[in-house]
Amino acid sequence: MAAKKKIAQTVITEGKYYTINAANGKVVEVADYNIDNGAKIQLWDNANAEWQQWNFVAAGDGVYRIQNRFTGKMLDLDMGGVSDGTRVHQWEGAQASSQLWVVEPTNDGRVKIKSNLAGKLLDPGMATENG
């Protein structure tokens, strides 16, 4: 009989705020605590600040809108872009597919965040420094 494979389960609680950590130890934040639409999203050292905290708001069918605690705005694909390297920024909540994200669990208990529109992962690229 084949051994059973244990798969990690990730539970997301709506109304709870999370930090989104990159593999390099940085966290996803709104740059310069900017509250404007189009404000840059960047990686920075974790300061446990509200602009580094995110609420995963269920949008149905395992899809989420990711809302910043400080600004109340959503993680959004710039211009609804779907190609590699598309910039991610914040924008007011809208019924836009550019604001829909899927959380995919990995076997080690972590998750990957993927754009439901583009099918591409939220990825810092080669970034290792703040900014």
Label the model's feature ranges.
Residues 44, 51-54, 91, 101:
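A residue-identity detector for tryptophan
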Residues 2-35, 53-82, 100-129:
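Extracellular glycan-recognition/adhesion modules and their associated mucin-like linkers
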Residues 39-45, 86-92:
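Aromatic-rich beta-strand patches that line glycan-recognition/binding surfaces
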Residues 48-49, 95-96:
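Short coil/turn segments at the loop-to-beta-strand junctions that recur within blades
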